[in-house]
Amino acid sequence: MKKVYYIGDWVVQIGPVYAETSFNHAAKGLDFINYGHWLRDALQSTGEFAVTSVPTWDFYNMKPGEYENILATHHIVIFSDVEAKNFQLHPQFFNRHLFGTKVLTFPDRVKVTVNALKSGVNMMFLGGWLSFNGELGKGGWGRTPLREILPVECLEVEDLRESTEGFCAEAVEKKHPMLKGLDLATMPPVLGFNRVRPREGCPVIARWKNEGDPAIAVGQFGKGRALAYTSDPAPHWGCNFVFWKQYAKLWSNAARWLTAGGGR
């Protein structure tokens, strides 16, 4: 069984918040919600893949060597709504008790990620407000060396394209293994996506109908394969998508294609 490590698509919900007077209010509820359970379950549905799903704060808090071990022991790593700061910063940088006591540096997770993919680890880069360039540029992937392993090019401005009417996908490379047995015409509309540019040498497998922007693109970088899906595999953008009858098949196909490239 092949191993998948899925980072992102968790949230902490605080509330509801009640205000009894002008001076007193209280949050009366706290919940951890894994919006990634649809993708996790889809990938595990065929019995070919075992998925570990973690929130971004687990990734951010990893000790030196922990992330490297994950990359060494997994076939696919997924990033969804994981802004660049989670790669570039470390909690110890904000520990005031350490200021002025020793040199604070850690392995560069961006470089580690790029080198891992080129060495044979396969990766999915999935959309959201904090993916690609993201809301107000918060995603920031294109401003880091992650751009070397993205099968699309990020915009330099906010890239969110949203509509209450939704956007439908259409196939471009209809014979690509990722689309085997799928009919994208039956895929429900998504409520948003990240606008990106096609990258030379990286096939666009599907695009957003009437928009022309890539929906799915793939690439080979060294020994590893990369996939970009520019909408969200989870709500809210994907609140209709997750109930698509072929949702699990799409992601199973994607994982099979990633791991069939001669890498890990």
Residue spans for each PLM region:
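An acidic, glycine-rich "communication" segment
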Residues: 1-2, 9-19, 23, 36, ...
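Helical hinge/lid and interdomain linker segments adjacent to catalytic or ligand-binding clefts
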Residues: 24-140
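Generic recognition of flexible, low-complexity loop/linker segments
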Residues: 65-66, 111-113, 192-193, 214-217
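Extracellular ligand-binding/catalytic regions of CAZymes and related secreted enzymes
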Residues: 1-12, 18-19, 69, 122, ...
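A structural signal for well-ordered alpha-helical segments within the folded catalytic domains
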Residues: 33-37, 144, 248-252
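Active-site-proximal beta-strand/loop segments in catalytic clefts of secreted hydrolases
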Residues: 7-10, 56, 80-82, 126-129, ...
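Sec/Tat-exported extracytoplasmic proteins
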Residues: 78-81, 117-121, 150-154, 254, ...
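Acidic/polar loop patches that form or flank catalytic/metal-binding clefts of enzymes
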Residues: 53, 157-158, 263-264
